[in-house]
Amino acid sequence: MDEKPAVSESSNGSDVDSLSTASAYEQHRERLRDANPQGVTSHRSGVNVKEAEEEFSELNRQFSTISHQAHCLSKQISRASKPTGKTEDVERSDSPADSDEPWDLETALRGNRDAETAAGIRSKRIGVIWDNLTVRGMGGVKTYIKTFPDAIIDFFNVPETIMHMLGYGKKGKEFEILRNFRGVLQPGEMVLVLGRPGSGCTTFLKTITNQRFGYTSIDGDVLYGIFDADTFAKRFRGEAVYNQEDDVHQPTLTVKQTLGFALDTKTPGKRPLGVSKAEFREKVINMLLKMFNIEHTANTVIGNQFIRGVSGGERRRVSIAEMMITSATVLAWDNSTRGLDASTALDFAKSLRIMTNIYKTTTFVSLYQASENIYKQFDKVLVIDSGRQVFFGPASEARSYFESLGFKERPRQTTPDYLTGCTDPFEREFKEGRSEDDVPSTPDSLVEAFNRSSYSERLAQEMDAYRKKLEQEKHVYEDFEIANQEAKRKFTPKSSVYSIPFHLQIWALMQRQFLIKWQDRFAQTVSWITSTGVAIILGTVWLRLPKTSAGAFTRGGLLFISLLFNGFQAFSELVSTMMGRSIVNKHRQFTFYRPSALWIAQILVDTTFAIARILVFSIIVYFMCGLVLDAGAFFTFILIIVLGYLCMTCFFRVIGCMSPDFDYAMKFASVVITLFVLTSGYLIQWSSEQEWLRWLYYINPFGLGFAALMVNEFKDLTMTCTADSLVPSGPGYDDMASRVCTLAGGEPGSVIIPGASYLAKTFSYFPGDLWRNFGIMVALTVGFLTLNLYHGETLQFGAGGRTVTFYQKENKERRALNGALMEKRTNRESKDQSAANLKITSKSVFTWEDVCYDVPVPSGTRRLLQSVYGYVQPGKLTALMGASGAGKTTLLDVLASRKNIGVISGNILVDGAPPPGSFLRTVSYAEQLDIHEPMQTVREALRFSADLRQPYETPQSEKYEYVEGIIQLLELEDLADAIIGTPETGLSVEERKRVTIGVELAAKPELLLFLDEPTSGLDSQSAFNIIRFLRKLAAAGQAILCTIHQPNSALFENFDRLLLLQRGGECVYFGDIGEDSHVLLDYFRRNGADCPPDANPAEWMLDAIGAGQTRRIGDRDWGEIWRTSSEFEQVKREIIQIKAQRAEEVRQSGGSQIIVREYATPLWHQIKVVCKRTNIVFWRSRNYGFTRLFNHVVIALVTGLAFLNLDDSRASLQYRIFVIFNVTVLPAIILQQVEPRFEFSRLVFFRESACKSYSQFAFALSMVIAELPYSILCAVCFFLPLYYIPGFQAAPSRAGYQFLMVLITELFSVTLGQMISALTPNSFIASQINPPIVIIFSLFCGVAIPRPQMPGFWRAWLYQLDPFTRLISGMVTTELHGRTVSCSPSEFNRFQAPENQTCGEYMLPFFERGGLGYLADNTTQACEYCAYKIGDEFYSAFSMSFNTRWRDLGIFLAFIGSNLIILFLAVSFMSPRCRLRYKLIYDIF
């Protein structure tokens, strides 16, 4: 196989480092110049591209001993890339100037290829041709947001609901995403795909790599060599791969482990001579780490939002490296340079160029921001406008083509910006004398122009020539097929698209799964602590169970809870299965492994971890509780618990595979779990179940497992009847012949109860059920696993096509506002439109002097900022620039008072005085992350900011008018009523960025506007729009400080001043930029660095100071040059002058005009506005409310039907308690929904509270109030079926009390979830705390173990502190008080009265002494005794009283009050700083 190592870029700045001496380098370069007079090289590039092909033949002669060379190269790379294990960001590593031995990518790649050729590995080359390609998808239309009532209405549309649950059904209107694309890309060629966001670039890349899922139809022809798309997908799926824009990885694996796993599945069967699998693996990993300059992260975990790991830029590089390991022949890279600095992005592009040249791959690349040097790496360019192909041809001729159409280019505009700009009606300009009338200006007209051009004719000729070439070069495709087979390892079927056989996939995945589980220390620690803690609690509660009638029922309760707890430990598999879909889908298209292999590997590894945890749990429970001391019974106990866990694990994974989203999964799981618990045989015995429920026993892991555990425990157990259980009992009743034990299975005249008899009479369980149930459980586990494997292989969920933007329906007010905005859009075409109509004023001047910032590190302290000086004036736009990791965001945070750890020194002043108490309120800070409440519309988000952050004295009408101006300024007219949504389903990245800026502008900052990377992740046109907006604001008088990452010339010329930082937080320049950057460039020129005339000053100055991977210009440190310069002294003088001048102006005007108060509005107004927003959000979050309501109704309905029309029998007394006990499941279903909702709202609150929008109290109160309507509705819908279907007492006094208890339980659960979420840093940790809390509440409330039987330690305090103690006591006594009991024939205890006595005469002393129950007939000698006469006698054994029910209700209400108090305190004091401390604790594990 033509195996290509996973490589992409050089990590150093030299051009040809493979040559040992400078003279050899010059001689070699001279030879190449003669052979390639038109070769293209890049200024200060880390990778030389055009020389690659010329050097190839030269290097072939140099590598004479292939095997020896391969070994040496491996050792060389291994030495050069030994991982350091540091966790610092790559951008903070030393610059290339300080690096050791240089490393050359070209030499390594050519050496690898040469070694492969010598080993007889055939070359893989395949081109792609597409013709009349049309792709259709769903969405892209104006869809109105659905609300909570809509969810209820849609649910009763049963057929459509079922279709949606299965992932089918209507998803919107079909539309064309791409239309009539045609082109050809031959092996060894690269094409750059350009287009505005939403134009179809991603769809084209997916389609061209055969990623067709999610699109409704794909028409036209796509050929991969001689293979059509279907054949190619079937036989060579892994040869066409797509690198998505998002980075999806296992967060607990290290970088090296992530790449190592990819190589475990992709290491070829045929390798260079003498290179073993282990050597090949290590060699490629080290090469990748070296190429991407991430050697220091080799042993650092990838991480995610919960786990601290590598930086975003490093994670992006790991994604790139992972796909390169696939060794595919057709590669598509979708905006893969996002998050990379310009130097790394350029090296990535050059690495693709080298790999494409040497390995003859076919490479498609889409980039949002591409420099001219990046553009030069490509052979062809494809330009897309609104799904239409408006140009495809040579990259070197594309610019001239669009110029010939009449489009004007701006000075210093890069070719990619120019080409994309020609498709943007607001950015393109026409040549003098030309206009839209004679220049193609619509997608259709541009297509027509291209079709009439010579480029279209040349393309047709090239496509025809390529088709003919396919017939002539059949040997190439024979080599391709042979190489594809040679890449497969031994035992891999020839028809398989995978590189390794199924058993090796399982083995590789088992190794990975073990690392995932082992390295997720926090989850493992919490799991073990929870399991061990619950085991100890169970052991102490049921400590040394007696082998008497008193321990029979509690022994069953212990077995049931043990099985249930460990079974529900598997619930996390549902979440992890759904969250892991994106990783599985990515690896599926990379052909790393079959999804079925993953599920098998997971179950094998998880079994190992589960056995260890369950073994400890079982040992504690089994021996502390004194279960049967028999080795066989003990190991059978463990076996059943483990099997129950595995069965539920497979079950939850099946749900995760089958469900299209988490809401559907939760709905389905709630129904099935409720049925499993109800039919388990503990709450209601099998013989007493409704006929329609009994069959569930045979597919119920809990029912089968519980029966097996009971048989295992009781089959050989002999119990003794206690005196309390003997009837009659007391003085005078000594003759056992006339007494009977009330425990089921007892025989008259005997105090011995065989366990088998007890099981048969009570549960209808028999000794033979044990291994029969074990076999059924094994079959269920295998069945669930089979379903898991099947659905994992056949089902795939995800989005294809464009995402849908939802809108709020227009009313009269919004219709009028939108009409006014549309009328003003005509001003949009005026490029010099000002923002003066917004009346932005900012007179104060912000200065900082000698600012230093030190943070604590394990070794002491680390200085991130060092003596930084500067100022920002009204009407000036100041850029803050520097390399990644130089401290730009840190400086912004320090200046904006957003840092809450470390030590800040220096002077930060407003008008020469310390910032006032209202500073945070008067400064707007647009953070890099666009965090918004997703269910708000754009207009609502801006109005919310204006309502709370502009002075309360400003009339609301004036605030809202100002908001309309902001909408117009930010060109958001079409999106004013659009729901912001999430990046996956909502506004695009660029649109969200504009909303972020709009929210800050709507606050009308009195002092300063900070912006952190406002152009990050945007395409060039969007970035230009953002900077143009800022330019308008500055012209209107706003003071702005903005960090920006590698702007092009057009962006850079909009700034007035520059603050430039180098690594270490040192300033290297602060001052004016000047027209055409002449002031800035003059400073550098005078200090030894001369900018070439054709270079972008913004990029060049960063290279000059060594910000990228190139060496700095000059020997002196640029920070030192600045500190000794006259410009620095001038800045200090200007700051002193500005402070004095502004202080005098403030004094003369009678003081600062800024109102000094913490919040702009009073508390009552904050509560009003925040509550309104929160209620709207809940109303629109239809799945949140409806899923909760659905779970309530289903659980209540199923429970009610299971206990349908309970009679007055003795068993029904217990069943009524179990029905009431089901109310305690409410916290379990409420906490898992409330906590994530609260956490996300808190994340938004942290962002909004940082600028003092509203108080913590207003936030917490609004969350509580917003939950009230849904809590009341859920309580009503839960109460009605649960209460009336079983036939509970219908008297208003009883039913009303019971409803109050259900409602209080609902409110208690909601406030409990909010309290837990407020006390924990994230919902994951909260979810780990929930199970023990719910278990403790349910265990100590008096049902699972009655109060008299509870150990004194727990009874003395925890029983009283358990909120559910009051719930159970109040509801049980209210239901059973005064209820007459009528035993069924099977429930009577039968015994013979002594001779010459009737039953009534014999039992009279017993009843006179307060004995419970009654006799069926007092006149006979054959006595039939019922243990209870009225319900009061039943619950008296639980130490409950009807007289205390209102006290219980009051105490239960008090628990809600305590939740609220803790919630408000936690929200007030749990700042992001406190959450950071929790985060550090989390990271320790």
Swiss-Prot record:
SMART domains reported for this sequence: AAA
The protein's annotated catalytic reaction(s) are: fluconazole(in) + ATP + H2O = fluconazole(out) + ADP + phosphate + H(+)
Region annotation Disordered: residue ranges? 1-57, 75-111
User: ABC transporter domain: from which residue to which, for each copy?
Assistant: 163-411, 846-1089
Report biased composition (Basic and acidic residues) as residue ranges.
Answer: 85-95
The conditions that induce or repress this protein are given as: Expression is highly induced in a single triazole-resistant isolate (DI16-8).
Q: Which CDD domains match?
A: ABCG_PDR_domain1, ABCG_PDR_domain2
Q: Which InterPro entries match?
A: AAA+_ATPase (IPR003593), ABC2_TM (IPR013525), ABC_trans_N (IPR029481), ABC_transporter-like_ATP-bd (IPR003439), ABC_transporter-like_CS (IPR017871), ABCG_dom (IPR043926), ABCG_PDR_1 (IPR034001), ABCG_PDR_2 (IPR034003)
Q: Which GO terms describe its cellular component?
A: plasma membrane
**Which Pfam family, just one, is annotated for this protein?**
ABC2_membrane_7
Give UniProt keywords alphabetically: ATP-binding, Cell membrane, Glycoprotein, Membrane, Nucleotide-binding, Repeat, Transmembrane, Transmembrane helix, Transport
**TM segments?**
522-542, 556-576, 600-620, 623-643, 664-684, 691-711, 774-794, 1184-1204, 1211-1231, 1268-1288, 1299-1319, 1325-1345, 1449-1469
Question: Is Magnesium found in the keyword set?
Answer: no
Record: residues binding ATP: 882-889
Membrane topology summary: Multi-pass membrane protein
Determine if Glycosyltransferase is one of this entry's keywords: no
The listed locations are: Cell membrane
Compositional bias (Polar residues) spans? 8-24
Where does the UniProt entry place glycosylation sites?
Answer: 12, 132, 335, 451, 1396, 1418
Activity control, as annotated, is:
The efflux inhibitor FK506 does not impair the transport activity.
Q: Where is the signal peptide?
A: none
Q: What does this protein do?
A: ABC efflux transporter that confers resistance to fluconazole (FLC) but shows no resistance to other azoles. Is also able to transport rhodamine 6G (R-6G), a known substrate for many ABC transporters.
* Family affiliation: Belongs to the ABC transporter superfamily. ABCG family. PDR (TC 3.A.1.205) subfamily.
Q: What is this protein called?
A: ABC multidrug transporter I
Chain's gene name: abcI
